[in-house]
């Protein structure tokens, strides 16, 4: 199952992705039995995403992202105990680890010129490219040891459900903000001295 889209959820975006899928499949000999690719294109509701995460045929979540600010879908997957295989770099490392998920190694490389996007992805930017051999090994490890990775994912689920509650994140944010603002000037109430009333002269 491939859930993705281009810059929009348009018909042209969907056609472009389908063309890319077919282009990749055509790189292999015609007598090879390739797996089916089911494209989910567009925006899904929270209920639909939850159904997808918990579908009995969905065994793991895989993302070879070049970089994430946070990676919400990845954390959502951990919250339901779904094994995660993902690029071993960027924001999602805050809630994933090598012992309870599969972090694929790679390296930071300059973005291709074709991916430069004005004011978004500048020519001097770098992004993370996975090591494809490690990714191949990761797929085999997941397939051959799914029970092991499901058990590890359950452990990570309990950790993240306890650690990333709204209450605890509010407390964490408060600690961070206080750490940087404790020495800032504070507003002080102006207290003028009390003066004795001057007697009127006769």
Model region roles, listed by residue range:
Residues 57-59, 81, 88:
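A short alpha->beta transition loop at the rim of the catalytic pocket in nucleotide-sugar-dependent
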Residues 66:
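Aromatic "clamp/platform" in nucleotide-sugar-dependent glycosyltransferases that forms part
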